[in-house]
Curated annotation (Swiss-Prot):
Family note: Belongs to the XRCC4-XLF family. XLF subfamily.
Protein name: Non-homologous end-joining factor 1
UniProt source species: Rattus norvegicus
Low complexity composition-biased segments: 241-257
Domain remarks in the Swiss-Prot or TrEMBL record: The coiled-coil region mediates homodimerization. The Leu-lock (Leu-120) site inserts into a hydrophobic pocket in XRCC4.
Length: 304
């Protein structure tokens, strides 16, 4: 079942519009079974079954159909995959070959699927129970924290690029260059003012979750990239036998790494441990001169 769990983690969330409501869902289907996660933005639901359960449920729901579990799983994959793949572009012009309905009880969410298999009606019921806190953490909390940190880093890179562009424009102006089209003139980028304006004017619209569709439409590729990175980091630490404290998989580790980076960058001189300092102090003026020379050759930042 590890293949199913990892496959589910690597899938993006898809937006499903049903007659009753809309859902976010992700699924992983193999010849050994399937795993499904569903969320209505209030609760997360989960089901994972093997071939034995698939065979038993297929007999209960489709008495006229006889086929191996792999055939039913393949059909479910064919039914769900296009729906998930094109979730961002669902419209009346591209109706699904299957119909979906959803019933929610106190402790279970049932997603019903009606389709055709070999010319005969095929029904399937996904019986999803409330997901464990571990699953919610693996599929939502940790990936979304990773997405947030990635977007933050992206913004920082763009801000640095804008400052470089402003310096380039200033150099052109100082050399006598003049814009031929005044409408292209821009003011130098001021990050704090930009952030304040964004918080006031753009934030309410930008963070509107709605029914989850904007998230499924705009962040699928980044979500998958983040989860892939986290899976690879876990596999690396599992193979090495080390405790999982890497900054790539731990939000605290990532935050600590970001906090430590500026300290490393502004350090004026290399630090030496005591065993290394003592022989240098006792080695005479030649070694001291070499140390001074090394300090003079220390590279400086571009705008230092």
């Amino acid at each position: 079942m590890e293949e199913l769990e990892q496959g589910l983690l690597m899938q993006p969330w898809a937006w499903l519009q049903l007659a009753e409501n809309s859902l976010l869902a992700k699924a992983s289907i193999t010849k050994h079974g399937y795993a499904l996660l569903i969320s209505d933005l209030q609760q997360v639901w989960h089901e994972q079954v093997d071939t034995l359960e698939v065979s038993q449920r297929a007999k209960e729901l489709n008495k006229r159909l006889t086929a191996p579990p792999a055939a039913f799983l393949h059909h479910l994959d064919e039914v769900l995959r296009p729906l998930f793949k094109d979730s961002a572009h669902q419209d009346a012009a591209h109706p699904s070959k299957a119909t979906f309905s959803c019933d929610r009880g106190e402790e279970v969410l049932i997603l019903r699927v009606r389709s055709e298999l070999s010319g005969l009606p095929f029904n399937w019921h996904f019986h999803c129970l409330p997901a464990s806190s571990l699953l919610v953490s693996q599929h939502l909390i940790c990936p979304l924290m990773g997405v947030s940190l990635a977007l933050h880093s992206h913004v920082r890179e763009l801000a640095a690029l804008l400052r470089m562009k402003d310096l380039e424009i200033q150099a052109y102006q100082e050399s006598g260059a003049v814009l031929s089209r005044g409408r292209l003139k821009t003011e130098p980028f001021e990050e704090n003012s930009f952030l304040e304006q964004f918080m006031v004017e753009k934030l309410p619209e930008a963070c509107a979750v709605g029914d989850g569709r904007p998230f499924a439409m705009n962040l699928q590729s980044l979500y998958v990239a983040v989860t892939k990175q986290q899976v690879q980091a876990r596999q690396k630490h599992k193979g090495s036998g080390e405790p999982q404290t890497s900054s790539s998989t731990s939000p605290q580790g990532t935050d600590s790494q970001l906090q430590n980076q500026p300290e490393q960058q502004i350090s004026p001189t290399p630090t030496l441990s005591e065993p290394e300092c003592e022989p240098m102090a006792a080695s005479g003026p030649v070694h001291r001169a070499q140390l001074v020379k090394a300090k003079r050759k220390k590279p400086r930042g571009l705008f230092s």
